[in-house]
Design a protein with these regions (language model features):
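Short linear motifs in exposed loops
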Residues: 47, 125-126, 142, 232, ...
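Short, solvent-exposed polar/charged micro-motifs at secondary-structure junctions
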Residues: 15-17, 60-62, 167-177, 228-234
Length: 258
């Protein structure tokens, strides 16, 4: 059969990695469905990739000592011939996104979090600015959402927080609640034509949540008729808007119950 290659990257750096469809179907998709993140493959020719501790502030200079060990989730940074050196007339954005090296090169901070597996493959776990600091630890969107997306009545899901985490923009900027004080909320867009009642679906989704350690803290499910998305590509969910909607929805429910 035909082999389809998929790439990972960004406007500032593309491609970063490559992965073939056979490997996805044979191996990595199963791990994704179990909450392991999305495998984006191995580095493209000429590209260097590292995973470093998550920081919100600029990193003044590069050191290999920043690199996290295999299997540990952190911020993805890349260096190579396709990496842009700066943002035009945006010195603060450049300072935040670029890590200078001694030889004048730069590492670009992708704004994504992920980890390397034992085979040297990079796994993506979501946007850095969308992580949620919950009572049990840090929740990353892709590993959490993927286990719920396996339900036949779910078109897609989005993990947000009504307390502010998960409502930051893609640069990671914005207000955060104190660590451990964020309340995760699972927003679900149902598959059209599904006949299961909301209450029954909620019970089944919460049963899935309890089946995995990393999702066991999720106890609130809300149903949205159609997620707000970027019209240029339907996959990018505007989580900031969804978090605001979720907060208002919960406030309304609490007022009705009181």
């Amino acid at each position: 059969g035909t082999e389809v290659l998929t790439s990972y990257g960004a406007t500032e750096s593309l491609p970063v990695t490559m992965l073939g469809s056979r490997e996805i179907l044979r191996e990595t998709r199963r791990i994704t469905d179990q909450g392991g993140g999305v495998c984006v493959g191995r580095s493209a020719p000429g590209m260097h990739i590292r995973v470093v501790p998550i920081h919100e502030e600029p990193i003044e200079s590069w050191s290999e000592d920043l690199t996290l060990p295999q299997g540990e989730i952190g911020e993805i940074v890349v260096r190579g011939p396709v990496v842009t050196p700066s943002y035009y007339n945006r010195p603060q954005a450049t300072k935040l996104a670029k890590i200078p090296t001694e030889n004048g090169d730069v590492w670009h901070r992708m704004g994504d979090v992920g980890y390397f597996d034992a085979q040297g493959r990079l796994w993506m776990c979501g946007r850095k600015g969308h992580r949620i600091e919950a009572e049990t630890g840090t929740l990353y969107t892709i590993p959490c959402e993927a286990v719920f997306d396996t339900h036949p009545a779910v078109r897609r899901s989005a993990l947000v927080s009504v307390d502010g985490a998960g409502a930051r923009d893609d640069t990671g900027e914005g207000e955060n609640p104190p660590p451990g004080h964020a309340t995760p909320v699972l927003c679900v867009e149902r598959l059209k034509g599904s006949s299961i009642e909301d209450q029954r679906l909620t019970e089944e989704l919460l049963e899935i949540a309890r089946s995995y350690e990393h999702t066991s803290v999720i106890t609130t499910v809300l149903y949205h008729p159609s997620f707000p998305v970027d019209i240029r590509h339907n996959a990018k969910i505007f989580r900031e808007k969804l978090a605001i909607w979720a907060g208002k929805r919960l406030e309304s429910q609490q007022s009705s119950d009181s």
